[in-house]
Amino acid sequence: MTAAVLGATAASAQNFEQYGSEAGWNIAIKEDMGPGCLMMKTNEDGTQIQMGIDATGELKGYMALYMKTPANLAKGDDFEVLFDVDGDQFEGEAIGQEIEGYKGAYVLVNNPDFIYDLAKKKQLTITPKGHRQVLVNLDGTNAAFETLRACQDAQAQ
């Protein structure tokens, strides 16, 4: 996986069109992503996770994390991030962003199938350098990823 730039916004501050929900994930269309589709949920600790497809040009995978809790992260800050998917590790570069009380970041990956392939995995661990680790349990997400793919396929028509 080649990771490109990271930056995130609060779900409440973004314009989404609800597409559906599966396995605790909301699936939505985001017009300014091509339109692209993403699936999102909030962990018990308040961390919000988004994964999907950016279709603004050549299709890319998209992952975003953001939180309301104070973080040592400022808009425009560059930092490294490590993704661990069931023991396979990938590195990327992140750019911080702050919107309406949320701080976070997103990453674009050159292979959109990387996002869909997460359905076959058990856990995604995201570790931004200098920030706390975020665990994403992927067990049982296959239905959500199938709905995400159906959403994205519908946008291409």
Task: Locate the predicted segments by residue.
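N-terminal signal peptide c-region/cleavage motif recognized by signal peptidases
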Residues: 8-10
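A generic "folded-domain core" signal
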Residues: 13-157
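Sec-dependent signal peptide recognition
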Residues: 1-2
